[in-house]
Amino acid sequence: MAEVGPGRVTVSRLGRGLRLGHRRPQTWEISDSDGEGVPAREVGTQAPSPAGERRAAAKALRADQVLGRLVVCVDPAVLEDAGSDILMEALGTLGCECRIEPQHQARSLQWNVVRPDPAPSNVPLEAKAENEQEQLLLLEPQEFLQGAAQLTQITDPPCSIPWLSPKSLTRSHLAVIGLDAYLWSHQLSSQKTWQLKKSKEAHARGAISWAEVEEILVLLQLHANLDVLLMASWQELSQYVCAFTRALSQLPSKQHRDSQAFSFCTAGHWASGQQVTRDGSGLRGVWWRQIRQFNRVSPAVADAVVTAFPSPRLLQQALLDCSTEQERLSLLADLPVKAHKGKQPRRVGPDLSRRICIFLTTTNPDLLLDLSS
Protein backbone atom coordinates (compact mmCIF):
# COMPACT_ATOMS: atom_id res chain seq x y z
CA MET A 1 0.00 0.00 0.00
CA ALA A 2 2.93 2.33 0.65
CA GLU A 3 4.14 1.93 -2.90
CA VAL A 4 0.82 2.92 -4.44
CA GLY A 5 0.72 6.68 -4.34
CA PRO A 6 -2.91 7.33 -5.18
CA GLY A 7 -4.13 4.61 -2.83
CA ARG A 8 -2.14 5.97 0.06
CA VAL A 9 -3.47 9.46 -0.47
CA THR A 10 -7.06 8.24 -0.61
CA VAL A 11 -6.77 6.21 2.59
CA SER A 12 -5.20 9.07 4.50
CA ARG A 13 -7.98 11.40 3.45
CA LEU A 14 -10.59 8.91 4.60
CA GLY A 15 -8.78 8.39 7.86
CA ARG A 16 -8.61 12.07 8.63
CA GLY A 17 -12.29 12.39 7.85
CA LEU A 18 -13.25 9.55 10.20
CA ARG A 19 -11.01 10.79 13.02
CA LEU A 20 -12.45 14.28 12.81
CA GLY A 21 -15.96 12.90 12.85
CA HIS A 22 -16.90 14.28 9.42
CA ARG A 23 -19.24 12.27 7.30
CA ARG A 24 -17.95 11.69 3.81
CA PRO A 25 -20.44 13.01 1.26
CA GLN A 26 -21.63 10.42 -1.20
CA THR A 27 -20.67 12.56 -4.17
CA TRP A 28 -17.01 11.89 -3.27
CA GLU A 29 -17.21 8.47 -4.89
CA ILE A 30 -15.49 7.89 -8.18
CA SER A 31 -18.67 6.65 -9.83
CA ASP A 32 -20.35 9.98 -9.17
CA SER A 33 -17.47 11.95 -10.63
CA ASP A 34 -17.52 9.79 -13.73
CA GLY A 35 -21.22 10.39 -14.10
CA GLU A 36 -20.68 14.13 -13.93
CA GLY A 37 -18.10 14.03 -16.72
CA VAL A 38 -20.37 12.40 -19.25
CA PRO A 39 -22.76 15.33 -19.71
CA ALA A 40 -19.76 17.66 -20.09
CA ARG A 41 -18.47 15.58 -22.97
CA GLU A 42 -21.91 15.38 -24.52
CA VAL A 43 -22.25 19.16 -24.45
CA GLY A 44 -18.99 19.51 -26.35
CA THR A 45 -20.18 17.17 -29.10
CA GLN A 46 -23.55 18.79 -29.66
CA ALA A 47 -24.46 19.76 -33.22
CA PRO A 48 -23.78 23.41 -34.12
CA SER A 49 -26.69 25.80 -34.01
CA PRO A 50 -28.39 26.98 -37.23
CA ALA A 51 -27.00 30.47 -36.67
CA GLY A 52 -23.49 29.05 -36.40
CA GLU A 53 -23.95 27.08 -39.60
CA ARG A 54 -25.14 30.19 -41.40
CA ARG A 55 -22.12 32.12 -40.20
CA ALA A 56 -19.80 29.31 -41.30
CA ALA A 57 -21.51 29.15 -44.68
CA ALA A 58 -21.24 32.90 -45.20
CA LYS A 59 -17.58 32.85 -44.22
CA ALA A 60 -16.81 29.95 -46.56
CA LEU A 61 -18.33 31.86 -49.47
CA ARG A 62 -16.31 35.01 -48.91
CA ALA A 63 -13.99 35.89 -51.77
CA ASP A 64 -10.88 35.87 -49.59
CA GLN A 65 -11.74 32.42 -48.24
CA VAL A 66 -12.38 30.98 -51.70
CA LEU A 67 -9.22 32.61 -53.03
CA GLY A 68 -7.22 30.82 -50.36
CA ARG A 69 -8.65 27.50 -51.57
CA LEU A 70 -8.09 28.22 -55.25
CA VAL A 71 -5.38 26.19 -56.93
CA VAL A 72 -3.87 27.36 -60.22
CA CYS A 73 -2.26 24.41 -61.98
CA VAL A 74 0.44 25.47 -64.44
CA ASP A 75 1.80 23.12 -67.07
CA PRO A 76 5.62 22.81 -66.98
CA ALA A 77 5.81 23.76 -70.66
CA VAL A 78 4.67 27.27 -69.74
CA LEU A 79 7.86 27.78 -67.73
CA GLU A 80 10.01 27.25 -70.80
CA ASP A 81 9.20 30.77 -71.96
CA ALA A 82 11.42 33.51 -70.59
CA GLY A 83 8.45 35.73 -69.74
CA SER A 84 6.80 33.11 -67.54
CA ASP A 85 8.63 34.48 -64.49
CA ILE A 86 6.32 37.51 -64.61
CA LEU A 87 3.29 35.23 -64.51
CA MET A 88 4.58 33.10 -61.65
CA GLU A 89 5.55 36.15 -59.61
CA ALA A 90 2.07 37.63 -60.07
CA LEU A 91 0.43 34.36 -59.00
CA GLY A 92 2.69 34.21 -55.95
CA THR A 93 1.48 37.57 -54.68
CA LEU A 94 -2.18 36.83 -55.37
CA GLY A 95 -2.81 34.66 -52.31
CA CYS A 96 -3.85 31.43 -54.03
CA GLU A 97 -1.93 28.18 -54.32
CA CYS A 98 0.10 27.61 -57.47
CA ARG A 99 1.14 24.12 -58.57
CA ILE A 100 3.42 23.03 -61.39
CA GLU A 101 1.72 19.93 -62.76
CA PRO A 102 1.50 18.37 -66.23
CA GLN A 103 -1.85 19.21 -67.77
CA HIS A 104 -3.94 17.40 -70.35
CA GLN A 105 -2.89 20.03 -72.87
CA ALA A 106 0.60 21.46 -72.92
CA ARG A 107 1.12 25.18 -72.21
CA SER A 108 -2.14 25.52 -70.31
CA LEU A 109 -3.37 26.75 -66.94
CA GLN A 110 -6.27 25.24 -65.05
CA TRP A 111 -8.18 26.48 -62.00
CA ASN A 112 -9.42 24.16 -59.25
CA VAL A 113 -11.04 24.84 -55.87
CA VAL A 114 -10.37 22.76 -52.76
CA ARG A 115 -13.43 22.27 -50.55
CA PRO A 116 -13.07 23.22 -46.87
CA ASP A 117 -12.62 20.28 -44.49
CA PRO A 118 -15.05 19.82 -42.94
CA ALA A 119 -17.35 21.69 -45.27
CA PRO A 120 -20.53 23.26 -43.85
CA SER A 121 -23.60 21.31 -44.89
CA ASN A 122 -25.39 24.29 -46.40
CA VAL A 123 -22.43 25.70 -48.32
CA PRO A 124 -22.98 25.33 -52.09
CA LEU A 125 -20.19 24.06 -54.27
CA GLU A 126 -17.98 27.06 -54.85
CA ALA A 127 -16.14 25.32 -57.65
CA LYS A 128 -17.78 24.40 -60.87
CA ALA A 129 -18.29 20.77 -61.64
CA GLU A 130 -15.30 18.89 -62.94
CA ASN A 131 -16.66 18.99 -66.47
CA GLU A 132 -16.92 22.80 -66.27
CA GLN A 133 -13.45 23.69 -65.00
CA GLU A 134 -11.73 26.70 -66.49
CA GLN A 135 -8.66 26.32 -68.67
CA LEU A 136 -6.43 28.87 -70.37
CA LEU A 137 -4.40 27.58 -73.30
CA LEU A 138 -1.36 29.58 -74.42
CA LEU A 139 -0.64 29.54 -78.14
CA GLU A 140 2.28 30.77 -80.18
CA PRO A 141 1.30 33.24 -82.94
CA GLN A 142 2.34 30.83 -85.67
CA GLU A 143 0.39 27.98 -84.06
CA PHE A 144 -2.73 30.13 -83.85
CA LEU A 145 -2.45 31.27 -87.47
CA GLN A 146 -2.05 27.72 -88.70
CA GLY A 147 -5.27 26.71 -86.99
CA ALA A 148 -6.98 29.87 -88.26
CA ALA A 149 -5.95 29.00 -91.81
CA GLN A 150 -7.66 25.62 -91.43
CA LEU A 151 -10.85 27.28 -90.24
CA THR A 152 -10.91 29.66 -93.21
CA GLN A 153 -11.16 26.68 -95.54
CA ILE A 154 -14.33 25.42 -93.81
CA THR A 155 -17.62 26.77 -95.12
CA ASP A 156 -19.85 25.30 -92.41
CA PRO A 157 -19.55 26.07 -88.69
CA PRO A 158 -16.58 24.16 -87.25
CA CYS A 159 -17.32 20.87 -85.53
CA SER A 160 -13.92 20.77 -83.81
CA ILE A 161 -11.35 23.36 -82.84
CA PRO A 162 -7.80 22.77 -84.16
CA TRP A 163 -6.07 23.65 -80.88
CA LEU A 164 -8.36 21.81 -78.47
CA SER A 165 -8.94 18.15 -77.82
CA PRO A 166 -12.51 17.06 -78.65
CA LYS A 167 -12.57 15.01 -75.43
CA SER A 168 -11.71 17.97 -73.23
CA LEU A 169 -14.22 18.54 -70.43
CA THR A 170 -12.98 21.98 -69.45
CA ARG A 171 -14.25 25.36 -70.56
CA SER A 172 -11.29 26.65 -72.50
CA HIS A 173 -9.97 30.07 -73.35
CA LEU A 174 -7.16 30.84 -75.78
CA ALA A 175 -4.40 33.38 -75.24
CA VAL A 176 -1.98 34.46 -77.96
CA ILE A 177 0.97 36.62 -76.98
CA GLY A 178 2.50 38.93 -79.57
CA LEU A 179 0.23 38.11 -82.50
CA ASP A 180 0.13 41.67 -83.82
CA ALA A 181 3.92 42.00 -83.69
CA TYR A 182 4.30 38.65 -85.40
CA LEU A 183 1.97 39.66 -88.21
CA TRP A 184 3.71 42.96 -88.74
CA SER A 185 7.08 41.22 -88.93
CA HIS A 186 5.74 38.96 -91.70
CA GLN A 187 4.03 41.71 -93.68
CA LEU A 188 4.30 41.50 -97.46
CA SER A 189 4.61 44.73 -99.45
CA SER A 190 2.10 47.35 -98.21
CA GLN A 191 -0.73 44.96 -97.37
CA LYS A 192 -1.25 43.11 -94.10
CA THR A 193 -0.71 39.66 -95.58
CA TRP A 194 1.58 37.12 -93.99
CA GLN A 195 2.86 33.74 -95.11
CA LEU A 196 2.11 30.70 -92.95
CA LYS A 197 4.82 28.06 -92.72
CA LYS A 198 3.34 24.61 -93.18
CA SER A 199 4.77 21.13 -93.33
CA LYS A 200 5.44 19.33 -96.58
CA GLU A 201 2.48 17.01 -96.00
CA ALA A 202 0.12 19.93 -95.56
CA HIS A 203 -1.28 22.14 -98.25
CA ALA A 204 0.86 24.45 -100.26
CA ARG A 205 1.92 27.74 -98.77
CA GLY A 206 -1.09 29.91 -97.96
CA ALA A 207 -1.62 33.45 -96.76
CA ILE A 208 -4.01 34.95 -94.25
CA SER A 209 -4.91 38.58 -93.71
CA TRP A 210 -5.77 40.46 -90.54
CA ALA A 211 -9.37 40.76 -91.70
CA GLU A 212 -9.56 36.98 -91.89
CA VAL A 213 -8.11 36.73 -88.39
CA GLU A 214 -10.90 38.97 -87.11
CA GLU A 215 -13.46 36.78 -88.88
CA ILE A 216 -11.98 33.74 -87.16
CA LEU A 217 -12.28 35.45 -83.79
CA VAL A 218 -15.96 36.14 -84.40
CA LEU A 219 -16.51 32.60 -85.68
CA LEU A 220 -14.94 31.07 -82.58
CA GLN A 221 -16.97 33.30 -80.31
CA LEU A 222 -20.34 32.65 -81.95
CA HIS A 223 -20.15 28.99 -82.94
CA ALA A 224 -17.69 27.54 -80.41
CA ASN A 225 -18.20 29.92 -77.46
CA LEU A 226 -14.43 30.25 -77.33
CA ASP A 227 -12.70 33.43 -76.23
CA VAL A 228 -9.40 34.33 -77.86
CA LEU A 229 -7.30 36.80 -75.90
CA LEU A 230 -4.71 38.72 -77.90
CA MET A 231 -2.01 39.82 -75.48
CA ALA A 232 0.88 42.12 -76.28
CA SER A 233 3.18 40.86 -73.50
CA TRP A 234 3.49 38.51 -70.57
CA GLN A 235 2.80 41.43 -68.27
CA GLU A 236 -0.63 41.87 -69.84
CA LEU A 237 -1.27 38.13 -69.62
CA SER A 238 -0.33 38.12 -65.93
CA GLN A 239 -2.78 40.94 -65.22
CA TYR A 240 -5.54 39.02 -66.97
CA VAL A 241 -4.79 35.76 -65.12
CA CYS A 242 -4.87 37.57 -61.76
CA ALA A 243 -8.13 39.34 -62.61
CA PHE A 244 -9.67 36.06 -63.80
CA THR A 245 -8.59 34.31 -60.60
CA ARG A 246 -10.15 37.02 -58.44
CA ALA A 247 -13.35 36.78 -60.48
CA LEU A 248 -13.49 33.03 -59.84
CA SER A 249 -13.10 33.64 -56.11
CA GLN A 250 -16.07 36.03 -56.17
CA LEU A 251 -18.25 33.72 -58.24
CA PRO A 252 -19.56 31.48 -55.39
CA SER A 253 -20.85 34.38 -53.31
CA LYS A 254 -22.49 35.94 -56.35
CA GLN A 255 -24.14 32.68 -57.35
CA HIS A 256 -25.40 32.14 -53.80
CA ARG A 257 -26.67 35.71 -53.62
CA ASP A 258 -28.47 35.43 -56.94
CA SER A 259 -30.09 32.15 -55.90
CA GLN A 260 -31.57 33.71 -52.77
CA ALA A 261 -34.84 35.63 -52.88
CA PHE A 262 -34.61 39.27 -51.97
CA SER A 263 -35.89 39.86 -48.46
CA PHE A 264 -38.11 42.74 -49.47
CA CYS A 265 -39.88 40.56 -52.06
CA THR A 266 -41.36 38.34 -49.37
CA ALA A 267 -41.19 40.06 -46.00
CA GLY A 268 -40.52 43.73 -46.72
CA HIS A 269 -43.10 46.48 -46.72
CA TRP A 270 -41.67 49.61 -48.24
CA ALA A 271 -40.11 47.94 -51.27
CA SER A 272 -42.46 45.02 -51.78
CA GLY A 273 -45.09 47.19 -53.44
CA GLN A 274 -48.81 47.13 -52.81
CA GLN A 275 -50.25 43.68 -52.33
CA VAL A 276 -53.21 43.02 -54.63
CA THR A 277 -55.51 40.06 -54.03
CA ARG A 278 -57.57 38.17 -56.58
CA ASP A 279 -60.72 40.12 -55.76
CA GLY A 280 -58.99 43.39 -56.68
CA SER A 281 -58.48 44.80 -53.22
CA GLY A 282 -55.27 46.77 -53.15
CA LEU A 283 -55.56 48.23 -56.66
CA ARG A 284 -56.41 51.60 -55.21
CA GLY A 285 -53.15 51.54 -53.28
CA VAL A 286 -51.27 50.77 -56.49
CA TRP A 287 -52.97 53.71 -58.21
CA TRP A 288 -52.02 55.94 -55.28
CA ARG A 289 -48.37 54.87 -55.56
CA GLN A 290 -48.39 55.62 -59.29
CA ILE A 291 -49.58 59.16 -58.65
CA ARG A 292 -46.84 59.56 -56.06
CA GLN A 293 -44.22 58.71 -58.68
CA PHE A 294 -44.76 62.06 -60.38
CA ASN A 295 -42.37 64.80 -59.32
CA ARG A 296 -43.43 67.10 -56.48
CA VAL A 297 -46.51 65.10 -55.46
CA SER A 298 -47.22 64.86 -51.75
CA PRO A 299 -49.31 62.11 -50.12
CA ALA A 300 -52.15 64.59 -49.60
CA VAL A 301 -52.23 65.48 -53.30
CA ALA A 302 -52.22 61.79 -54.25
CA ASP A 303 -55.11 61.24 -51.83
CA ALA A 304 -57.10 63.99 -53.53
CA VAL A 305 -56.64 62.49 -57.01
CA VAL A 306 -57.38 58.93 -55.89
CA THR A 307 -60.45 60.04 -53.94
CA ALA A 308 -61.92 61.77 -56.99
CA PHE A 309 -60.94 58.99 -59.42
CA PRO A 310 -60.39 55.65 -57.61
CA SER A 311 -58.84 54.01 -60.69
CA PRO A 312 -56.85 55.14 -63.74
CA ARG A 313 -59.60 53.79 -66.01
CA LEU A 314 -62.14 56.18 -64.49
CA LEU A 315 -59.77 59.11 -64.90
CA GLN A 316 -58.97 58.15 -68.46
CA GLN A 317 -62.66 57.92 -69.30
CA ALA A 318 -63.26 61.35 -67.76
CA LEU A 319 -60.46 62.80 -69.87
CA LEU A 320 -61.97 61.33 -73.02
CA ASP A 321 -65.34 62.85 -72.15
CA CYS A 322 -63.88 66.37 -72.10
CA SER A 323 -64.90 68.43 -75.14
CA THR A 324 -61.80 70.63 -75.44
CA GLU A 325 -58.09 70.21 -74.90
CA GLN A 326 -58.01 72.97 -72.29
CA GLU A 327 -60.77 71.30 -70.31
CA ARG A 328 -58.90 68.04 -70.46
CA LEU A 329 -55.62 69.55 -69.22
CA SER A 330 -57.28 71.33 -66.29
CA LEU A 331 -59.59 68.51 -65.24
CA LEU A 332 -57.73 67.86 -61.96
CA ALA A 333 -56.60 71.41 -61.29
CA ASP A 334 -59.46 72.39 -58.97
CA LEU A 335 -59.53 69.22 -56.87
CA PRO A 336 -59.28 70.24 -53.18
CA VAL A 337 -56.36 68.92 -51.18
CA LYS A 338 -56.90 68.19 -47.52
CA ALA A 339 -54.87 70.70 -45.53
CA HIS A 340 -53.35 70.22 -42.12
CA LYS A 341 -54.46 72.24 -39.14
CA GLY A 342 -53.42 75.86 -39.33
CA LYS A 343 -52.64 75.75 -43.07
CA GLN A 344 -54.51 77.30 -45.95
CA PRO A 345 -56.59 74.97 -48.15
CA ARG A 346 -55.08 74.33 -51.55
CA ARG A 347 -55.78 72.59 -54.85
CA VAL A 348 -54.04 70.03 -57.01
CA GLY A 349 -53.03 72.75 -59.43
CA PRO A 350 -52.76 73.03 -63.22
CA ASP A 351 -49.19 71.72 -63.47
CA LEU A 352 -49.87 68.27 -62.03
CA SER A 353 -53.22 68.13 -63.83
CA ARG A 354 -51.47 68.73 -67.14
CA ARG A 355 -48.78 66.12 -66.46
CA ILE A 356 -51.25 63.39 -65.46
CA CYS A 357 -53.45 64.20 -68.45
CA ILE A 358 -50.55 63.97 -70.90
CA PHE A 359 -49.33 60.78 -69.27
CA LEU A 360 -52.70 59.05 -69.77
CA THR A 361 -53.54 60.37 -73.24
CA THR A 362 -50.36 60.93 -75.23
CA THR A 363 -49.02 58.47 -77.80
CA ASN A 364 -45.63 60.16 -78.12
CA PRO A 365 -43.02 58.27 -76.04
CA ASP A 366 -40.52 61.15 -76.31
CA LEU A 367 -42.87 63.82 -74.97
CA LEU A 368 -41.53 65.60 -71.90
CA LEU A 369 -44.04 65.63 -69.05
CA ASP A 370 -42.26 67.91 -66.63
CA LEU A 371 -41.53 71.30 -68.22
CA SER A 372 -39.39 72.38 -65.28
CA SER A 373 -36.89 69.52 -65.66
UniProtKB/Swiss-Prot annotation:
Print the keywords alphabetically: DNA damage, DNA recombination, DNA repair, Nucleus
Q: List each coiled-coil range.
A: none
Enumerate the residue ranges of region (Disordered).
24-52
GO BP term, example: replication fork processing
Listed GO CC annotations: endodeoxyribonuclease complex; Holliday junction resolvase complex; nuclear replication fork
Q: Where is the signal peptide?
A: none
Q: Which Gene3D superfamilies match?
A: 3.40.50.10130, Crossover junction endonuclease EME1, DNA-binding domain
Region Helix-hairpin-helix (2HhH), annotated ranges:
282-373
Where, per UniProt, does this protein localize? Nucleus
InterPro entries registered for this protein in UniProt: EME1/EME2_C (IPR042530), ERCC4_domain (IPR006166), Mms4/EME1/EME2 (IPR033310), XPF_nuclease_EME2 (IPR047523)
Provide a Gene Ontology MF annotation, just one. DNA binding
Stretches the record annotates as Nuclease-like domain: 47-260
| Pfam assignment, any one | EME1-MUS81_C
Principal subcellular localisation of the protein:
nucleus
**Similarity field:** Belongs to the EME1/MMS4 family.
Q: What does this protein do?
A: Non-catalytic subunit of the structure-specific, heterodimeric DNA endonuclease MUS81-EME2 which is involved in the maintenance of genome stability. In the complex, EME2 is required for DNA cleavage, participating in DNA recognition and bending. MUS81-EME2 cleaves 3'-flaps and nicked Holliday junctions, and exhibit limited endonuclease activity with 5' flaps and nicked double-stranded DNAs. MUS81-EME2 which is active during the replication of DNA is more specifically involved in replication fork processing.
Query: How does it associate, per the subunit comment?
Result: Part of the heterodimeric MUS81-EME2 complex; the complex forms specifically during the DNA replication phase of the cell cycle.
Spell out the protein name for this chain.
Structure-specific endonuclease subunit EME2
Q: Which organism is it from?
A: Mus musculus (Mouse)
